[in-house]
Regions:
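Extracellular/periplasmic carbohydrate-active domains that bind, remodel
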Residues: 1-275
Length: 275
């Protein structure tokens, strides 16, 4: 059996327990991090969180009866600074609209640095990613989307170029260039982005709002919970996505995307949330 390092950053890592299983391992294992038992697992892909930058870690995998089955060592990446969204004005009380405060932290974040969303409930509309961003949703942190359509930016389907020889496509709906509301989390032409943690992104959709008359365009078509357009080298790790207004994860003309331990929770009868 092999224990492999799949990815690492300054604050998290992903390991693979290759015992012949596909999604689930053939037995339950205990994970020790620098000698301390961290958790038990029966899945092949496992995420490690709450790590420290530029720190050496050894991961040891044992069976339930204490037999060592494999290990892997690594040193976490460098981190320059952490920008806590609370320091930018976010309240995390579920009442204040925290969009502009979190967006300010994202725009202010330098390379090799982290935007941290600590425990709390953050009411938002659309957040826009930028390149070279590490964005952590801590355990107990939840981004909850507003359901007021008037609060969301709109993406036109097609914008004609000045010389009328080409066009710029922004909005999309079911394969056609049509107006759409910006995604709850949106990345346009971004690269080298990491979104990770034990937190939740909640689209807050229900049959009282986004899922009511879902095929009818009201202002624009429904937003995606996570929308990437013409982007590359984007990694999602550990985050839970729930109650999406439409498609949950929608990569559009994007490359080299990685998803590790992501959870998607939508009602089985919710419209178009299977993406």
């Amino acid at each position: 059996m092999d224990v492999r390092l799949i990815m690492k950053s300054a604050r998290n890592a992903v390991i693979e327990i290759a015992d012949g299983g596909i999604y689930n391992t053939k037995e339950t294992y205990h994970i020790l991090l620098n000698g301390e038992e961290t958790f038990s697992t029966d899945t092949v892909i496992n995420s490690l969180f709450d790590l420290k930058p530029q720190t050496k870690y050894e991961v040891l995998v044992k069976t339930a009866d204490g037999v060592e089955r494999g290990n892997v060592s690594f040193v976490t990446a460098y981190e320059f600074v952490t920008l806590n969204v609370r320091d930018f004005g976010a309240a995390g009380d579920g009442k204040q609209d925290d969009t502009k405060f979190i967006q300010a932290a994202i725009l202010a974040c330098p390379k090799e640095s982290r935007v941290l969303v600590p425990k709390g409930t953050y009411r938002i509309t659309s957040l826009f990613l930028k390149s070279n961003l590490r964005f952590e949703l801590a355990k107990g942190a939840e981004l909850v989307a507003d359901t007021d359509r008037a609060s969301y930016p709109k993406f036109p389907g097609v914008i004609e170029s000045y010389d009328e020889t080409s066009e710029y496509n922004l909005g999309t709906w079911e394969g056609n260039p049509l107006p759409m509301f910006a995604g709850i989390i949106t990345g346009l032409d971004v690269e080298n982005v990491l979104i990770y943690g034990k937190g939740t992104i909640n689209g807050n959709a229900s049959k009282e709002n986004w899922w009511k008359n879902p095929k009818v365009m009201v202002g624009a078509f429904r937003p995606r919970l996570f929308f990437l357009s013409h982007s590359q080298n984007v990694t999602l790790c550990g985050v839970t996505f729930k109650n999406s207004p439409s498609w949950t994860l929608h990569p559009y003309f994007s490359d080299n995307l990685k998803f590790y331990g992501v959870t998607i929770n939508n009602p089985s009868d919710s419209p178009n949330t299977d993406g």
